[in-house]
Amino acid sequence: MATEKTAQDTGIETALGTLLRPLNSEYGKVAPGWGTTVLMGTFMALFAVFLVIILEIYNSSVLLEDVPMSWQ
């Protein structure tokens, strides 16, 4: 059964695993509140604006009507 307790194999302990263990010490911990969600949303919005600008340059869109573009 899924709820049944079983003996767990701890595996092989290596030097590399010991060195990398501190990187995984925060596993499962959640910061209270919104944390850095607002910062992430801001950067996502800025990235979306960047992508729109690149797309408009590629398509020679409305905002760039007066800018001459030539690939020759």
Curated annotation (Swiss-Prot):
GO terms for biological process: photosynthesis; protein stabilization. It comes from Oltmannsiellopsis viridis (Marine flagellate). PSII is composed of 1 copy each of membrane proteins PsbA, PsbB, PsbC, PsbD, PsbE, PsbF, PsbH, PsbI, PsbJ, PsbK, PsbL, PsbM, PsbT, PsbX, PsbY, PsbZ, Psb30/Ycf12, at least 3 peripheral proteins of the oxygen-evolving complex and a large number of cofactors. It forms dimeric complexes. It comes from the Eukaryota. The keyword Transport does not apply. Disulfide bonds: none annotated. One of the components of the core complex of photosystem II (PSII), required for its stability and/or assembly. PSII is a light-driven water:plastoquinone oxidoreductase that uses light energy to abstract electrons from H(2)O, generating O(2) and a proton gradient subsequently used for ATP formation. It consists of a core antenna complex that captures photons, and an electron transfer chain that converts photonic excitation into a charge separation. It is a single-pass membrane protein. Keywords: Chloroplast, Membrane, Phosphoprotein, Photosynthesis, Photosystem II, Plastid, Thylakoid, Transmembrane, Transmembrane helix. This is Photosystem II reaction center protein H. The gene is psbH. It is found in: Plastid, Chloroplast thylakoid membrane. The chain crosses the membrane at residues 38-58. One of its GO terms (molecular function) is phosphate ion binding. One of its GO terms (cellular component) is chloroplast thylakoid membrane. Belongs to the PsbH family. Signal peptide: none annotated. NCBIfam families: PRK02624.1 (NF002728). The modification Phosphothreonine is found at residue 3. InterPro entries: PSII_PsbH (IPR001056), PSII_PsbH_sf (IPR036863). Phosphorylation is a light-dependent reaction catalyzed by a membrane-bound kinase; phosphorylation occurs on Thr residue(s) in the N-terminus of the protein.
